[in-house]
């Protein structure tokens, strides 16, 4: 009975449910399409399906009007969905720009190759978020994984036979495009400027970007948002994007195809160094800008020596350089009289050239530090001040090597300084002004160190012979000449002041030789204490030596300040972050080092102590060679041939093997070349090649000798990676020429600079061509 009642009422319930369900679905569809969400091709949503009873399966019967309305709403929803998708992607007209919109966070990962249009990121391309984490990662990221193939080999052989004008930028930058992988750094370096500019302008045709003449990595939709009025910027999804102004501020970073904390490489092949400045400079600025308070607890907790240390000693330091021209000529005349028995001091004074320096006015010291400023004995030459050059009365030998850094003037200065040191003016506690006792009363008063170079603000280094202090002095911005001598920042000149004291067991004669050698050679190489009116005797990679001053207890050498520290600090900072210098960065430093050493060799001086601690840097990456205390003058102005020397000199890891052979003479120029090779390997490897180059005392060096004797190659050199196989091949060949145990087979610095490796190395310092 109960079942019959259910059966009789079931048809009525089904019709009502069907009608309600149809109305519910129609309303749901209307609401769905009005809001623009959902997909027009997918039918009812999950929420609409859940609203209907699951037990009822009677099909819906919509009216004709409902179907027409649904079709119209479907078309509207489809168009709306396409519009939304277009606005989300930020796609402009396909015929104008196929590039897809990329968020700011992924902007630096863009590839400059054809893969950029597909949104794929080449894993071989280095971007700013991928530091050189380790040796293995540096192989994968910095240099790219390259797999050899027959196609690449054949293409290399074909390209090698083609004329160089096909790749004008190739010969200028890297020199070898043969086996370069698409998407790597070397691919970008190989592109000609016309190719890079054309491809960049296709990506961005913005009028503003054309005026800036820059290479855009941004999609067209961002570079010119007003191009397509149908897709305004405000309708785009902004979850992962930023404003155009903020994006333009990151333009320089996005243009770099490689970027680290200290080095960047750009698509046109040039690079930029941005080395950090030592903290003491920033601390000084903060202390000067910070308001002074009457009391501070910080003084109780200082554990290092600060601004006040040794201030009294520096305040009493006086210069050993002559105060004016007259006194200097008078002293040199006395020295000549004593050595040559010439009593015509006044006559000699009239015949001496511009040999002095005005310490107070920073007069030009070029002639004193230049060997080629001395004419021959049978000639007499007047300068602009009316003084004449030396003649036969001086009994000076004829100069045969005008380029030598040690000439007549330098020899006289060495004798003068040596005499003062041997007489014990400073080291025996006599007054500082005793040095000036021979000067006439009309000579101007000498300036103390603090008056001339400012006050000390702290210690920046410490060596075996004393400490190095930093001094600063405010100057007038209208004095441009002084800015060339040393580091200049915020109307302040900074000077490095090196303290020189004899060791407890060091004989005075040895100390005077070391002191005069370091100062006079450095002064002569850097052009002396002058206002840079003539740059004929200056070199960008030689540290400027400015002055030598004295106190009752020590000597102080005033030098140019390099605010970015030395190469040793740069390498250790990279090692702490498990990275090494980029090969292009190391190549640039190597080329600068070789140019500086070449300049020294051309003037008769070998450094003999090349190591990372003696290579300083400016923030722009300019390398400066310093510390000439162990330098060897192998050829003076009166010698036609170079002289060899015996005995080891320098630091053991950088010393050439022939120096350790007892009583064997060696060419100091070839020793410098060996040391330069060690320096380069330390930069790219992050560690020494070996501790000492003596057979039987170092297992690594023994392995090197064994590999070279049996196989003619060393695995360390072969495993080094570069940005291209061509550059890697050129570099490896040069390293084998450097590390020849037999010095007679070793390459010279001049020949190394002419090698394919160095000729294709991009350097941030421009050097004038050497005269033939």
Curated annotation (Swiss-Prot):
Protein kinase domain location is 454-758
One molecular function GO term is: protein serine kinase activity
Quote the biased-composition stretches of kind Low complexity, using this chain's numbering.
Answer: 20-33, 41-59, 146-158
Q: Which UniProt keywords apply?
A: ATP-binding, Kinase, Nucleotide-binding, Serine/threonine-protein kinase, Transferase
Under the heading SMART domains, the entry gives: S_TKc
> How would you classify this enzyme at the top EC level?
transferase
Q: Which reaction does it catalyse?
A: L-seryl-[protein] + ATP = O-phospho-L-seryl-[protein] + ADP + H(+); L-threonyl-[protein] + ATP = O-phospho-L-threonyl-[protein] + ADP + H(+)
User: In which family does this protein belong, per the annotation?
Assistant: Belongs to the protein kinase superfamily. CAMK Ser/Thr protein kinase family. NPR/HAL subfamily. HAL5 sub-subfamily.
The record's PANTHER family line, in alphabetical order, gives:
SERINE/THREONINE KINASE (PTHR24343), SERINE_THREONINE-PROTEIN KINASE HAL5-RELATED (PTHR24343:SF43)
Q: What is this protein called?
A: Probable serine/threonine-protein kinase HAL5-like
What are the top taxonomic ranks of the organism?
Eukaryota, Fungi, Dikarya, Ascomycota, Saccharomycotina
